[in-house]
């Protein structure tokens, strides 16, 4: 169960793709685009301190198994030994922005290792961002298993 939770936490790595040289969504406010890029790097590098800044204290993940995960569990999943994630492409992207908030999501096939064991899972997900006290943070993520293309 711990492995499954770690796998599903990886879904929030929305912008982790091969083509990182360009901004993922130039229509986003610069501060949000920067936070998204930092969040991406923090997940890929297992940077717990950065994740701690970029996840809201009241962050919640509803994973594809119907389990609920909080900020501490999410950070643990990304910083645990034997965890890695390969770059991936997001399909059917959803990008919505309004003053103080945003939804970023899509469908991705994720591959990597969790607790040293390989995994591959296809998920549809949504990350909810909020601007609080002048900084952008992820406040909520939902993940659902997606059918094969």
Q: What is the predicted function of each stretch?
A:
Residues 8-9, 19:
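Cleavable N-terminal signal peptides
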Residues 1-6:
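Bacterial N-terminal signal peptides that target proteins for export
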Residues 22-55, 60-149:
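A beta-strand edge to alpha-helix "cap/lid" segment located at domain peripheries
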Residues 13-16:
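N-terminal signal peptide c-region/cleavage motif recognized by signal peptidases
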């Amino acid at each position: 169960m711990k492995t499954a939770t770690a796998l599903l936490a990886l879904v929030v790595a929305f912008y982790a793709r091969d083509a990182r040289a360009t901004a993922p969504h130039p229509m986003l406010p610069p501060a949000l685009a920067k936070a998204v890029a930092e969040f991406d790097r923090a997940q890929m590098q297992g940077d717990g301190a950065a994740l701690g800044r970029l996840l809201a204290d009241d962050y919640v993940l509803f994973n594809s198994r119907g389990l609920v995960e909080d900020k501490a569990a999410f950070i643990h999943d990304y910083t645990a030994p034997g965890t890695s994630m390969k770059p991936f492409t997001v399909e059917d992207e959803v990008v919505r922005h309004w003053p103080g908030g945003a939804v970023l999501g899509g469908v991705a096939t994720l591959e990597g290792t969790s607790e040293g064991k390989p995994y591959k899972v296809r998920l549809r997900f949504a990350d909810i961002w909020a601007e609080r006290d002048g900084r952008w943070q992820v406040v909520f993520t939902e993940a659902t298993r997606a059918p094969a293309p």
